[in-house]
């Protein structure tokens, strides 16, 4: 039995299938972990959701910012952008079932035996694990409730950007979703910066990647995340793994086998040749 962790799929269904064939993934015996952003940009978001849902207990995933945006589009809150290529999913006969399944997926995965946690963007250094788990449950409960459109309508925005246990209501939920799904850079005190899109080498002082600021979770657990394709899986501490390697932009889909830390890749079926693609990789 093996545990395979794969970075952001972004609708790259063919590459996902090829990568799972490469590692000889066996549902029912092996477990697949997915860092979120299953949908958008690649051509096969519908097929990805259908396949991942079919895996049942053999998959553990987290929601990413593009997954949350899809929920907002389906709810009529946000606009369907042609570049996201999700129209076939929105118009599918099983769209309701897929969306209802997706909005009941978690923001955080924890395996105590493996001392392993996974979140789409990472874990803010301002949180210990019990706080992260409680915060994840707050948003997950709203997403699974009938009032989820209210949260989806309020989730867009960059403030508040500093954690406080005294945060309440939609402001609290927005901070939590930003920390789990959009975070890249922080100030030295752990306060989020939602604006910088530079590479770590070019980021202005005093900003640092969230994983470069000591936090309590990383002291006890390995952390797996996606979201940040321009890292190309490099530059993180030894126990923190960046798995988004930009498959939908012409890069690769990356898989980490947890038991021996072997890394497998599947090249994208497309090339990043447009200015929009290059800008997206840089961000």
Swiss-Prot record:
One Pfam short name? Metallophos
Report the enzyme's class at the first EC level. hydrolase
Keywords, in A-Z order: Hydrolase
Q: Which InterPro entries match?
A: ApaH, Calcineurin-like_PHP_ApaH, Metallo-depent_PP-like
EC number, UniProt record: 3.6.1.41
The catalytic activity, as recorded, is: P(1),P(4)-bis(5'-adenosyl) tetraphosphate + H2O = 2 ADP + 2 H(+)
| Coiled-coil region list | none
Q: What does the protein in this record do?
A: Hydrolyzes diadenosine 5',5'''-P1,P4-tetraphosphate to yield ADP.
Q: Which NCBIfam families match?
A: apaH (TIGR00668), PRK00166.1 (NF001204)
User: Which family would the database say this protein is a member of?
Assistant: Belongs to the Ap4A hydrolase family.
Q: Which HAMAP family match?
A: ApaH
Q: What is this protein called?
A: Bis(5'-nucleosyl)-tetraphosphatase, symmetrical
> Taxonomy-wise, where does this protein's organism fall, top ranks first?
Bacteria, Pseudomonadati, Pseudomonadota, Gammaproteobacteria, Enterobacterales
Name of the encoding gene: apaH
